[in-house]
């Protein structure tokens, strides 16, 4: 149960992230049924006298571009999955199709220059007047974050949970103290802490306190008691750590951590980010299957079609199997031994997701 006061307090906190003048145009991409869009995409604009344009249908990149070209917004709120698709099909596809450019982009200085130019094209994609790209609803792939930084696109990562109305942490625009890879610091009037942190990594459950924290779960006192601990601190169910400056780093969901027989904790989201960075991977999910780590991969059919057009089914499958084996080898080289993938399976359809494009992991757990 979220009160009027909870939502208003959170909208006030969000207003400290960027100065919004009356008449500023927002484009709403996420559904209003989600607390992030309701607070940051509706209440915040109303609080500041802004105008909101709604997509009104499934927000594919083509539809987002169309409405942005028409409305020319200064603020766009998106889910990471949409950004990943734009990045793969409008940025990385150019490197794959131009071998010379792909070769030279292995050099950091040239890659930064390429990304800067790609950033200018993405500014046009969003209508040419973008002042803020607000990213929330799920974790952002680190590779996408590096691109946004090198492309000089104005973006803010937000972190929150519905029980907190939902915003808990974000990186105020222009704050040099925001650490790359983090979701920024606690927003105004919110306190964060890590419960029972690991002595070596500092990772533990993220807990929050503030005027935005829920009243409880409707007609469920037991669940409320489990979620709200002493002095109104909320157990978020997310794992993370805080650095000395107060930057919050998200590691994954408490209930999605894979504990191997060796006692090692595996955070599947971190591995999935690496898999999803592959151009032929649309999305992926890592799970445990009889003591080993298994990756389910839903391939990008358009990408594969462009490279196997005219091939018969067996040859197409052989090509995909080779890609998957190379991907497993490459990803495993960047992972600790305990986190390496033992098997990769092709998943035949998109994974079932929430309204904010988070995979419903519980449907695929064995």
Task: Name the predicted role of every residue range.
Residues 213, 247-276, 303-318, 336-341:
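Adenylate-forming
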Residues 258, 283, 291-294, 326-366:
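Conserved C-terminal "lid"/linker of ANL adenylate-forming enzymes
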Residues 52-55, 124, 128-129, 142-191, ...:
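Conserved ATP-binding loop and adjacent catalytic segment of the adenylate-forming AMP-binding
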Residues 200-260, 265:
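Conserved ATP-binding/catalytic segment of the ANL
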Residues 137, 160, 184, 238, ...:
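Active-site glycine-centered loops adjacent to acidic/histidine catalytic or metal-binding residues
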Residues 8-25, 32-121, 129:
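Conserved AMP-binding/adenylation subdomain of ANL enzymes
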Residues 239, 278-302:
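C-terminal boundary motif of the adenylate-forming
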Residues 74-77, 87-177, 282:
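Gly/Ser/Thr-rich phosphate-binding loop
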